Amino acid sequence: MSEESQTTWWSSNLTQRLLSGMVMVLVAILSLAYGTTQWVGLLVLVVVILGMQEYRAMLSQQKVHLNRRGWLYSAFFLSISPLLGGIGALNAMLILVAGGWILNEMVFSRKQQLEELHSLGWVLFGLFWVGWSFPHITLIKDLPYGELNLCLLLVVIVLTDSLAYFGGRKFGITPLATGISPKKT
């Protein structure tokens, strides 16, 4: 089915989305249920690196450019810190990484005006949103009933995302965030 012919209210890539989603959910559930904390930590590392790279790419489209190497180091250190020392290590690493970005932007960059430092806000938001929140999966895994809690969290995320997708396709009229996703309603 071509992009122009809309004979159904769902998109032409629904099959691809369903297949890739089922594979990802299967890997996630098996990893959470049967994997060690280190294995889950490795998966979290991959997800955080990919997520932070996607966040960086979205910022690049808005003319906010981040140092690629520093961004990858930030993702790596934030992801492995729960394996090294739990929540304390994760929080300490967030402070160190955020402090490093602040120092870099305020001292070592050539930005002269306060308006030029808006990228720092986006960096700190991304570090917290992606880099700090996802490694908590590793910490939750070690809690009593942690595997069950993470599986339930995964089910809630999949259901809300799916319902939002189908609701947007069925009832959506007004475009939302066209700069990020031109067809999102």
Q: What spans do the regions from the language model cover?
A:
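Membrane-embedded alpha-helical bundles of polytopic integral membrane proteins
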Residues: S2-T185
